[in-house]
Amino acid sequence: MDFNLNTLQHFALVFFEITAIVITLAICLLLLAVLYMYIADVTQSRHTIRRNYPVLGRFRYLFEHLGEFFRQYLFAQDREEMPFNRAQRAWVYRAAKNIDSTVAFGSTQPINRPGDFILLNGPFPPLEEEIKPRSAITFGAGYARQPYSTNAFFNISAMSFGALSVPAIRALSRGAHQAGIWLNTGEGAVSTYHLEGGCDLVFQIGTAKYGVRDEHGALSDDKLRAVASHEQVRMFEIKLSQGAKPGKGGILPGIKVTEVIASTRGIPVGQDSLSPNRHTDISCVDDLLDMLHRVRTITGKPVGMKAVIGQAAWLDEFCRRINERGLQYAPDFFTVDSGDGGTGAAPQSLIDYMGLPIQNSLPLVVNKLQEHGLRERVRVICSGKMINPAGVAAALCMGADCVNSARGFMFALGCVQSLQCNRNTCPTGITTHDEELQQGLDPTDKAHRVANYAANLMHEVEVIAHSCGVAEPRLLSREHLLIVS
């Protein structure tokens, strides 16, 4: 018994001695590190804060980094954050999870800021038996050999494979099929992951023409036919510009160009994928009309265009030349992208200041088409920060036939607005190709959330339409909307 006690005492003494030595060494190393940082800070001249406040000044970088993650949870109010505030995101999260999205007590939304909108209710909303189902809309009727019809007015906007991860694309494809909406492929070409869900696809032709380019980078008729041979590819969209970066081509950082993405796009692995700032074969309105007509003739499917509106004088020439050359040269649809649209990577000056917001550009395009007698020929789609029912309803009031959203569906997938899209470090696995980070994104579960979000949003837009006094959303018009001035 005494032997065991002595042995335990001996081991305890040895343990404490070793612990004391380790702690002493750690303190010495820490002091040496602090001394090294102090000398380095006071002798360097690049960083003023570190020179004036050696060692302590280094905490600035730590706090800046942590602020990206904690600011939205600890300091921001419900309606403060940009580009999307907590109230906007929370509605999407609840809709995607198919849980109660009602709120209590009163609104936190200010209604007196110039540029904001107010939806105008009608005195006699339709009764339940007077409500109509969503009407269908057809693209390319009378001009495309295979026109496309849908009754969905809310769809998934362009997000390319490369900007998004494999599980994100798979979830969007499956969810779009469940909800009966389309998925725009973005400019990164169509992949097997887009096709596997069985949803309708809109193939976007970007300035680099990924997926439909020949060895010289020009548009290939044979590859167009190959893409059009997929029954799921319902329409084609020629991208002129993007809301977050008008006049700048697409940017996919080399860190996100994996082997499968490089193979899909036809580019080198690991190198930055930089698209031209415009189509090399489109330098005027007539070139654009020729391209629209060519793609429709080859594919037999509806063909439209996507553009951010800034200088608007070209729209008159665009409409005039269509009437002069014939309606077969008109786009089957015109996607108006807001100047505050989203992106995976873009210069901040373009994100912040370039291009008109949708509340200015959408009515402008609709008015121009009406003035030139083209509104019935050209369907109008819009995109840009419309992730909640009220925003979608407002766009329908302003004249849109359909509304597309990209970031709304990213929130449905689980996006937490960490602003890491361009770093390949997205914590939710949506915009990263790090397989460890992708493990948290289950395509099967997230597909249900994508479908729930689309269904719940369209249902609530129907509720708004009924409050405005019309039987279904496509009957909304400008008399149902007030812009605060």
Please place each PLM-identified region on the residue numbering.
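Conserved, well-structured core domains of diverse proteins
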Residues: 2-182, 188-198, 203-244, 253, ...
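Internal alpha/beta core interface subdomains
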Residues: 166, 170, 179, 230-233, ...
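Flexible, glycine/charged-enriched surface loops at secondary-structure junctions
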Residues: 186-188, 301-306, 331, 375, ...
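Glycine-rich tight-turn/loop motif centered on a GG-T
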Residues: 203, 209-211, 254-283, 344-359, ...
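Phosphate/diphosphate-binding loops
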Residues: 213-240, 357, 367, 378, ...
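Mobile "lid/hinge" segments at catalytic clefts and subdomain interfaces of large enzymes
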Residues: 230-265, 419-436, 461
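Glycine-rich phosphate/ribose-binding loops and adjacent secondary-structure elements
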Residues: 274-438
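Active-site or pore-adjacent capping/gating segments
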Residues: 415-478
